From Swiss-Prot:
The keyword Acetylation does not apply. It comes from the Bacteria. It catalyses: a ribonucleoside 5'-triphosphate + H2O = a ribonucleoside 5'-phosphate + diphosphate + H(+); a 2'-deoxyribonucleoside 5'-triphosphate + H2O = a 2'-deoxyribonucleoside 5'-phosphate + diphosphate + H(+). Nucleoside triphosphate pyrophosphatase. May have a dual role in cell division arrest and in preventing the incorporation of modified nucleotides into cellular nucleic acids. It is found in: Cytoplasm. It comes from Synechococcus sp. (strain CC9311). Its EC number is 3.6.1.9. This is Nucleoside triphosphate pyrophosphatase. The active site is at 75 (proton acceptor). GO terms for biological process: nucleotide metabolic process. Its cofactor is a divalent metal cation. GO terms for cellular component: cytoplasm.
Length: 200
């Protein structure tokens, strides 16, 4: 059983579609307290903080679920022209970002951290090890008109997503091309997770 340290519905849907048994426990980590100038490093730090916080909650729980194989923390940001874009704070910011990004490439970074709890079974006498990395996918945005930008932002979808778009939703119509892992843009890299789980 995988424990997802995230409140993201998109990440949960990915796990459900991949038929990976899981539960969800929100970390409660204050993301505003974690900083790093490199977006790839930033998302790794955030993912590790979330996974570590949930691991601690699980280990201190009176109702310990020994079926939990590992805790997975994830966090995503969009890097565009040297700036890091998380979720837009409001519609005006989302519109301004889209007007800058349209017709251009950006990088979607997702940090992943997999931590086996201390009670997880060891393999060949070795203690379970934490694994953390960042997966990056390049995204080419469609050259939307102002009307198309405003219409998409008015749907409310961009306000819920890192970078201001949801590839699995209406935002999929606003992306021309991807270079890299598709599921990574939605919230986590399923190929990476498959490799990690096969080794744990």
């Amino acid at each position: 059983m995988l424990l997802l340290a995230s409140a993201s519905p998109a990440r949960r849907r990915l796990l459900e579609q991949a038929q990976i048994p899981h539960q969800v426990m929100v970390s409660g980590v204050d993301e505003d307290q974690i900083h790093h100038p490199d977006p790839a490093q930033l998302v790794q730090l955030l993912a590790e903080a979330k996974a570590s916080a949930v691991k601690l909650k699980v280990e201190q729980s009176a109702e310990l679920n020994v079926s939990i194989k590992a805790v997975l923390g994830c966090d995503s940001v969009l890097a565009f022209e040297g700036e890091v874009f998380g979720k837009p704070v409001d519609a005006a910011e989302a519109v301004a970002r889209w007007q800058r990004m349209r017709g251009k490439w950006a990088e979607l970074h997702t940090g992943h951290c997999l931590i086996p709890p201390s009670f997880a079974p060891t393999t060949e006498g070795r203690a379970p090890e934490m694994q953390c990395t960042c997966v990056t996918t390049r995204v080419l945005f469609a050259n939307l008109t102002d009307v198309e930008v405003e219409d998409y932002v008015a749907s409310g979808e961009p306000l819920q997503c890192a970078g201001g778009f949801a590839l699995e939703g209406r935002g999929g119509c606003c992306v021309e091309q991807l270079a890299g892992c598709y599921s990574n843009v939605i919230g986590l890299s399923l190929p990476l997770l498959r490799r990690w789980l096969s080794l744990s």
